[in-house]
């Protein structure tokens, strides 16, 4: 089996921040940490970037002109390919209200500025490892060929295997009800 090039093995990080000095600091630190960095200076640009490439992790400033980080996070989470990509807020907003809002909008972590690049890279690596484990577990369940799903307490399906999706589609088909499965 051919070995992947160094570039192919690098984690891809999308950094979304409107401050050039923060973008420069983070780009230098993340690239030195062996990661590939994509940059966006606002929420709309971030949404354009992810339409072309799905990053492994997203670093997102909360305070930006136009669409703020909280709105951007919610818009990113609404896209199925990004549902499991870790989004980490990095901002000067340290009030409990803002931290809670960051998590409520879909963030998995919240780092306050000034940012310590070494601590940030350690956090990124932890979130990346967790995301990989989750992806592997889901892939294994999908490959098992069984009808499995995860639902919220109110009954909304959060995740399902392809076999479960087939059954759910058949159950909601107007020509074939659940009694026809």
Predicted regions and their residues:
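PAS-family sensory domains
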Residues: 145, 149-181
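Acidic catalytic/metal-coordinating carboxylates
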Residues: 21, 41-45, 63, 68-72
